[in-house]
Swiss-Prot record:
Enzyme Commission number(s): 2.8.4.3
Function: Catalyzes the methylthiolation of N6-(dimethylallyl)adenosine (i(6)A), leading to the formation of 2-methylthio-N6-(dimethylallyl)adenosine (ms(2)i(6)A) at position 37 in tRNAs that read codons beginning with uridine.
Family classification: Belongs to the methylthiotransferase family. MiaB subfamily.
Binding positions for [4Fe-4S] cluster 2 per the UniProt entry: 175, 179, 182
Entry protein name: tRNA-2-methylthio-N(6)-dimethylallyladenosine synthase
Length: 458
């Protein structure tokens, strides 16, 4: 029998995956879950595509030119693959909402791509990857019959620890609202709510891995209506009360919400749960009832403003962020002024604003009376100046206050740490407190998007 000389053996190098993620927090979560799936196949993540064996581009289709960004990336990857030696092959995959929307068109325009996978098929990634390695071109953009979340592996605790003490947890996916500007119902499908049991188990996995703050995710997260173990249907408020009882969890958040699904039980949770952070992203898109109707938002501006009042009455320290679209088809100067009035009434801590761009397949793409681009530009600039003023006002209003901060990571300088304020903004503070601890700080100053604090004597 021939003996193996240990000196001539070397460990097999782990396979490396690089994932480029575009878009929303759910895409970030999806990329993390794909990483978890691949870790069971021997893959480790790398921060550079140059030494990757597998590159996945996780795409977003919400805004214009999303597909163009993808094809630009794929052009660079084509050159990278050409420069590879035979002993260092490269597999390329496209995932996310552009994958769902474009499908086979991606393979036609970019033959470098080996697999195209829609958001509902991530639980099959290891299996589909093996087929792609055998030379097959893979397209999987069907909506899964089975529950994809039930087939995803448990979180990789080591990977979770590397990501930090805050984590995303998807509880709901898809949307049934069919706003006329939005592609989400077509790329993510109908609303799916995970069960209470699934969510609780994943939350416990994250907590065991050191997570202290969980943000519940959904395209329409407050539309979540999951089944409990006894067969009852819970709403998001019920779920928040339930998760708040988990040992080791210090903070809860959720995003993104639709005004129509902000029910009284959810508002009560903001009143009753100190660990539910006083920050809410509640998009309205426009302040004009005429435009809201054209967008199929299913509410009027007065409903939204009344909702803001109810939430503030329940949680006076809450901060609101929002989304706004300018230049929707048919938007007049008067419609735009209604949006400005609404913003002035609400007083946002931050907001996202965009020029309308028609998305293929949506009702909005078939509408007439398009607004001139120069008018869109002027309106967007006007709106953003106002929103920036409100953001700065909010930041200045917190100077001199005391607040609790979740310490997340070391800062740039020795003895400095970066934490997360209740209002989501980062806080820089000189402290020896460990990552994951919650400390009280005194806000001394504010920049354009962060606070500077000092420890109190508490």
């Amino acid at each position: 029998m021939n003996k193996v000389n240990p000196k001539n053996t070397s460990p097999v190098a782990p396979k490396k995956v690089f994932i480029k993620t575009y878009g929303c927090q759910m895409n970030v979560y999806d990329s993390q879950r794909m990483t978890d799936s691949l870790s069971s196949q021997g893959y480790v993540t790398t921060q550079t595509p140059n030494d990757a064996d597998l590159i996945l581009v996780n795409t977003c289709h919400i805004r214009e030119k999303a597909a163009e960004k993808l094809y630009s990336d794929l052009g660079r990857l084509r050159v990278m693959r050409q420069e590879r030696t035979p002993d260092k092959p490269l597999t390329v995959g496209v995932t996310g909402c552009v994958a769902q929307a474009e499908g086979s068109e991606i393979l036609r325009r970019a033959p470098i791509v080996d697999l195209v996978i829609g958001p509902q098929m991530y639980h099959r990634l290891p299996e589909l990857l093996e087929k792609a390695k055998q030379g097959k071109k893979i397209i999987e953009t069907d909506y899964a019959v089975e529950d994809k979340f039930a087939h995803l592996p448990p979180h990789n605790k080591r990977a979770v620890r590397k990501r930090g003490v805050s984590a995303f947890l998807t509880v709901q996916e898809g949307c049934d609202k069919f706003c006329t500007f939005c592609v989400v119902p077509y790329t993510r499908g109908a609303e799916i709510s995970r069960s209470v049991e699934q969510i609780t188990e994943e939350a416990r996995q994250l907590i065991e891995a050191g997570v202290k703050e969980i943000t519940l995710l959904g395209q329409n997260v407050n539309g979540w209506h999951g089944q409990s173990a006894d067969g009852k249907t819970w709403r998001l408020g019920d779920l928040l009360y339930h998760l708040a009882k988990l040992d080791g969890l210090k903070r809860l958040r959720y995003t993104t919400s639709h005004p129509r699904d902000m029910d009284d039980s959810l508002i009560a949770a903001h009143r009753d749960l100190d660990m539910l952070m006083p920050y809410l992203h509640l998009p309205v898109q426009s302040g004009s009832d005429r435009i809201l109707k054209a967008m199929n938002r299913q509410h009027k501006s007065s409903y939204y403003l009344h909702l803001i009042e109810k939430i503030r009455a329940a949680r006076p320290d809450i901060a609101f962020s929002g989304d706004f679209i300018v230049g929707f088809p048919g938007e007049t100067d008067e419609d735009f002024e209604e949006t400005i009035k609404l913003i002035q009434q609400v007083q946002y801590s931050s907001a996202y604003s965009f020029k309308y761009s028609p998305r293929p397949g949506t009702v909005g793409a078939t509408m007439k009376n398009h607004v001139d681009e120069s008018v869109k530009d002027a309106r967007l600039q006007h709106l953003q100046v106002l929103l920036l003023e409100q953001q700065n006002t909010f930041l200045r209003s917190k100077i001199g206050q005391k607040t609790d901060v979740l310490i997340e990571k070391p800062g740039r300088h020795s003895g400095q740490m970066v934490g997360r304020s209740p209002w989501l903004l980062p806080v820089v503070v000189d402290t020896e407190s460990s990552t994951g601890s919650v400390v009280e700080i005194h806000i001394k100053n504010a920049s354009s998007n962060s606070f500077v604090g000092e420890m109190t004597n508490r």
